[in-house]
């Protein structure tokens, strides 16, 4: 029988891999990188066998599960956080820090992006409606 290795927090070290040979942290990192790349490049790939195509902020927002608006004390728009995955990994696009933030169990990943889609402006406009 093999010995169990533990993280600093005392939880067992996760070494199990998915069918692609990735650990949950590696899979979370890949997912966050892909989302950051889509926002930075203003392109998205619908299916693996198709090329990436240019998209608008409105098209990209169709895949958002939830929006948390950050407002000042007078309820004026400041920034937003967009939930793009949940249930297994939870992934938020933070328009304040300009980072894709992924959480899955004890794993946490952040990947920076440049908002070339204009998501912040889109959210500000939607908040004002």
Tell me what each language-model feature is.
Residues 2-84:
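Negatively charged, low-complexity tracts enriched in Asp/Glu with abundant Ser/Thr
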Residues 12, 23, 65, 90, ...:
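Compositionally biased, intrinsically disordered low-complexity regions
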Residues 18, 94-96, 116:
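Detector for Asparagine
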Residues 40, 47, 51, 94-96, ...:
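Generic alpha-helix signal with a bias toward terminal, lower-confidence helices
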Residues 74-109:
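Acidic, low-complexity, intrinsically disordered interaction modules
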Residues 98-129:
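Polybasic, proline/glycine-rich intrinsically disordered low-complexity segments
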